[in-house]
Amino acid sequence: VSKISSLISCRKYILKNKAGSIVAPSQITDQWLKDYKEARTQNIKLLYVGRIRKEKGIYSLLEIIKDSNINFSLSIIGAEKNSTNLIVQDNVYTHEVENNQKNLIKYYDDHNIFVLPSYTEGHPMVLLEALARQRPVIIFKEIEHVIGDKKGIFVAERNSDSFFKIIKHIQENYNGIQQEMKKNKLPTKDEFLKRF
């Protein structure tokens, strides 16, 4: 880093006590923060939005839910073109990558819990999207640093007992969790762009 350079990070700990700015990158527009659709919680509808790659933890998640006797479904949004048939598992539905904001918001609204099974993350946009649509989020211990001061994020161990225990907790306390989530101050695209 030269003497005229300035460090920019999305997390304070990444700066390692060096001078720099903390930014909150975001693609959240006003569209994400209005016209909320009430979630129905009788049937658990899990959502994952992201690439279908090992490092994203999706295969680990599929293994965790494979033998469950709980009534639920999982929608995966992020398959590459012509690869939606790569995952064949009961109650799992795979869809291609969705880039249209309106359609993506509908996916979040049509589900009641978002799952981010990644092994590593920096500043996941999908986490902000789920929170913007007031959908509780389940993550695993490896990325618990992404929680920060945000409400509505739950940490599970990477096993089915812990995962479904968290789902049950969310299902039984959904309204209260959503009330807490309304207190979240999420970064927006406009706020991010004003910094530069």
What are these regions (language model features)?
Residues 1-40:
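Donor nucleotide-sugar binding/catalytic pocket of nucleotide-sugar-dependent glycosyltransferases
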Residues 44, 48-67:
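A conserved mid-protein helix/loop that constitutes part of the nucleotide-sugar donor-binding site
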Residues 84-99:
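Nucleotide-activated donor-binding/catalytic signature segment of Leloir-type glycosyltransferases, i.e.
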Residues 106-111:
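Short alpha-helical donor nucleotide-sugar binding micro-motif in glycosyltransferases
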Residues 119:
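Aromatic "clamp/platform" in nucleotide-sugar-dependent glycosyltransferases that forms part
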Residues 132, 136-140:
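Short hydrophobic beta-strand element within catalytic cores of glycosyltransferases
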Residues 141, 152-161, 167-174:
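Conserved acidic donor-binding segment of nucleotide-sugar-dependent glycosyltransferases
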Residues 174-196:
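A charged, aromatic-enriched C-terminal amphipathic alpha-helix characteristic of glycosyltransferases
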